[in-house]
């Protein structure tokens, strides 16, 4: 599978946003440290565009807009409530938001995921489910086609540093 990278930078004083194509239907915007921003996963379904986490980098909303030129329905799935994952939520266009109960307390919008939820969007099968986490309680995982599973910070190193 060929991975294609696109660089996007409107904010010259900050890290560049990099869009990396995983396959025909899945891309992600790589995380940045200036400002701190999580991975943003974009799935192109037949009916909708699905976004897992919206990051916090100010260039992400513009980049997401270029990925959906036909203005298809946009569904956002939030892994958890930390700002580097939800910071751009109210800066992008979306039709529905799916998240855990604790994240809902921060967004006050959308659907709360408390058990497995399944969607079919053309050839793409989507599965949202609660994920216990030591990093942030109430994480929601996002599985695509039983091949990829996105966890946000659901699996997270408790300590940074060299393991040697």
Protein language model annotation of sequence segments:
Residues 1-24, 42-57, 94-164:
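Metallo-beta-lactamase
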Residues 56-122:
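Active-site HxH/HxHxD metal-binding segment of metal-dependent hydrolases
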Residues 18-20, 32-33, 41-42, 89, ...:
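Short secondary-structure boundary/capping segments
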Residues 28-40, 44-75:
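Pre-active-site segment of Zn-dependent metallo-hydrolases
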